[in-house]
Amino acid sequence: METATILGILIAAAVVGITVLALDTAFGPPAAELSDPFEDHED
């Protein structure tokens, strides 16, 4: 394969991996540890 093809696949895989990690952090089990600033704020 050409170098550009391999580089494109590598970059696409990195972007997909970062997206999956972000979605897992936002909606998966680690989300229970995140605080909600709107609930923490007292009016």
From Swiss-Prot:
Signal peptide: none annotated. The keyword RNA-binding does not apply. It comes from the Bacteria. The chain crosses the membrane at residues 3-23. One of its GO terms (biological process) is photosynthesis. Pfam families: PsbN. Keywords: Membrane, Thylakoid, Transmembrane, Transmembrane helix. It is found in: Cellular thylakoid membrane. May play a role in photosystem I and II biogenesis. Belongs to the PsbN family. This is Protein PsbN 1. It comes from Microcystis aeruginosa (strain NIES-843 / IAM M-2473). The lineage of its organism: Bacteria, Bacillati, Cyanobacteriota, Cyanophyceae, Oscillatoriophycideae.
